[in-house]
Swiss-Prot record:
Originating organism: Schizosaccharomyces pombe (strain 972 / ATCC 24843) (Fission yeast)
Lineage, top ranks: Eukaryota, Fungi, Dikarya, Ascomycota, Taphrinomycotina
Keyword Lipid biosynthesis among UniProt keywords: no
Name listed for the protein in its UniProt record: Probable lysophospholipase 5
Similarity-based family: Belongs to the lysophospholipase family.
Known function: Catalyzes the release of fatty acids from lysophospholipids.
Molecular function terms, GO-annotated: lysophospholipase activity; phospholipase A2 activity
């Protein structure tokens, strides 16, 4: 990752401005001389510039304390779904079944829908949006737009969004999930046109240089509010403030918009759209490479925590930020407002922890003053734990209630350090959808990740990583996963050039050859980014996209997801949706589906030839 000189300068100012350890002289960001240094030549302050005094009245970013409920705040994972999530699922089941019936009827798939959809044992779909910055967000947005029945009959897959129970995201995918969740699940066109403002840089959101300076000063002040309230802060807080202006609220910046407040949104209370989940990876102090078996944390509007062995517990999202000892608050006070939506999305997409390992060699090789300064800055971030999201540990002193033989890896630490949800190479957030408590039958995996070895196009590596994690952990705590080939096979067989189904036969998965039941691993439908209407292989670190580019990427993803609005492919999608339900109920697979599976399911072949180059060309005209 390359830091712009402007971005580096502002990052360098953040640390002394917050009073944090630094090798840089103290700098007062409000000093008139500093403002003079930043003032562009021959540019006067515009009359309509927003005064700093008005910006200072923005809602507080600082967490605050409230009285705690009695008893332990931690819920063991062995309890199953939280009460709040279960209530949401119960409200949504009938809506999902109704949407599925409409979609299946529209496709013309000949099955007895009443038998398949007549109870809570009907198909349960989860949609997973990959990481990869704004390009991944836009790829996911294109797929979601194609899946949205609110767009009428303009796409062949309209209704899939309404048929889904869960929506997960990590890194750039978390930006999409978080943005739709806090904006009352507005449609993609509205978000693109009226919220995201991607034609302005993430690091320079306004046309006027003074406005950009003032917004940075506002962000500094907001993060200082949090620090002065007694909480650890890091560069992730500033990152989250920048993201929130793009993704949460372009007018106020969402300084006090929390993820738990999603429960107050009309769509959530009515169960109208899928349950949102954002994930981040835990990093233990001293780790420079994140292992594949790291602890994966979930953020939902209901709670924060993990199903993973050793911790296996959750705290209510509204009280995230409360430091607990053995599940009990230290001073009988609970923290509120810590779960800032921008901060959570910033945590899930925190790439700063990857900067030092990725750039150390190249910076060291070029022995010049600027590179040495950058390297020194990055080392400082790592040494002082300022390159991670810092969360007061609710698990300190907590013995795992469901498995006392397993050590809680977070037990000694007062602070949990969280980083980009794809840091363990699992670039698609499958993990929350594999836990048996959620009963997910099929996962639609939207892959907009940038892979440098394949000219920026997906190569299936994210599926491979999750498959390897499941094998390495012996499926501990999860239902298993379909068999996945190596990335060379993806390229050689073209599995990354179109939607590909994995696990079509529920008896042939990592769970073994067993009768298909509620514990059978889900079928995975893989939707890779591909150049149907344009070259959408934009680098992860792109922070500004012209409207024509961003809208074009959304359109390209929609065309790729629908296979250019193919009615025959829509039938095959319907087959994937109902397959596990048919298998569980011992119902025969329709002949239409047999033909679909022959075309789209990976048949187990492993490529023997090595692919050395991969550079696809634009495929078709627009819809």
């Amino acid at each position: 990752m390359k830091l712009s000189s402007f971005g580096l300068f502002l990052a360098l100012q953040l640390l002394p401005a917050l009073g944090l350890p630094s090798r840089i002289d103290e700098v007062d960001v409000s000093d008139p001389e500093l403002i003079g240094l930043l003032k562009p030549d021959n540019v006067d302050k515009p009359a309509n510039s927003i005064p700093l005094s008005k910006r200072s009245t923005s809602p507080s970013y600082a967490p605050y304390t409230v009285a705690c409920p009695s008893g332990s705040l931690l819920r063991p994972a062995s309890d199953g779904l939280s009460t709040g999530e279960q209530e949401f699922v119960d409200k949504r089941v009938s809506k999902v079944n109704s949407a599925l019936e409409s979609f299946i009827s529209k496709t013309g798939l000949k099955i007895d829908t009443k038998s398949v959809l007549n109870d809570t044992d009907g198909p349960r779909l989860g949609i997973a949006i990959s990481g990869g910055g704004f390009p991944a967000m836009l790829t996911g947005a294109g797929a979601i737009n194609a899946f949205d029945a609110r767009n009428g009959n303009t796409t062949s897959l309209g209704g899939i969004l309404q048929s889904s129970m869960y929506l997960t995201g990590l890194s750039g995918g978390s930006w999409l999930v978080g943005s739709v969740a806090v904006n009352n699940f507005a449609n993609i066109t509205f978000l693109h046109d009226d919220v995201w403002n991607l034609d302005h840089s993430l690091f320079a959101p306004y046309d006027d240089a003074f406005e950009n300076f003032y917004i940075y000063q506002e962000w500094f002040e907001q993060v200082l509010q949090k620090k002065n309230a007694g909480f650890n802060v890091s560069i992730t807080d500033l990152w989250g403030r920048a993201l929130a202006l793009k993704l949460v609220n372009p007018l106020t910046g969402g300084a006090n918009t929390t993820f738990s407040s999603v429960t107050n949104e009309t769509w959530f209370q009515d169960g109208e759209f899928p349950f949102p989940i954002i994930i981040a990876d835990n990093v233990i102090e001293g780790e420079t490479v994140i292992p594949l078996n790291d602890t994966v944390f979930e953020f939902t509007p209901i709670e924060f925590g993990t199903w993973d062995t050793g911790v296996e517990s959750f705290i209510p999202m509204e009280y995230t930020g409360t430091h607990l000892i053995n599940g009990i608050p230290l001073n009988e006070s609970c923290v509120r407002n810590f779960d800032n939506a921008g901060f959570l999305m910033g945590t899930s997409s925190n790439v700063f922890s990857g900067i030092l390992p990725a750039t150390n060699a190249s910076l060291t090789a070029s022995n010049n003053t600027f590179n040495n300064a950058v390297l020194s800055f990055l080392e400082m971030l790592a040494e002082d734990q300022l390159d991670v999201g810092l969360y007061p540990n609710p698990y300190q002193g907590y013995g795992n209630a469901s498995n006392t033989t397993t050590t809680n890896p977070l037990e000694p630490y007062p602070i949990i350090e969280l980083i980009d949800g794809g840091s363990d190479s699992e670039g698609i957030p499958f993990w929350p959808l594999l836990h048996p408590q959620r009963d997910v039958d099929v996962i639609f995996a939207i892959d907009g990740g940038y892979q440098s070895a394949t000219s920026g196009w997906p190569d299936g590596s994210s599926l491979v990583s999750t498959y390897e994690r499941v094998l390495a952990t012996n499926s501990s705590g999860v239902r298993g996963f379909p068999y996945i080939p190596d990335t060379n096979t993806f390229l050689a067989l073209g599995l990354n050039t179109h939607p590909t189904f994995f696990g079509c036969d529920g008896r042939n998965t990592t769970a073994g050859n067993h009768t298909v039941n509620d514990d059978t691993p889900p079928l995975v439908v893989y939707f890779p980014n591909y150049p149907w209407t344009m070259y959408a292989n934009v680098t992860t670190y792109t922070v500004q996209l012209e409207d024509t580019l961003s809208s074009g990427m959304i359109e390209n993803a929609a065309v790729a997801a629908t296979q250019n609005n193919s009615d025959s492919f829509a039938v095959c999608v319907a087959c994937a949706l109902v397959q596990r339900s048919l298998e569980r109920k011992n119902m025969s697979t329709p002949s239409q589906c047999a033909s679909c599976f022959n075309q789209y399911c990976w048949n187990g072949t492993i490529a023997s030839t090595t692919v050395t180059t991969y550079a696809p060309t634009v495929l078709s005209a627009k819809i």
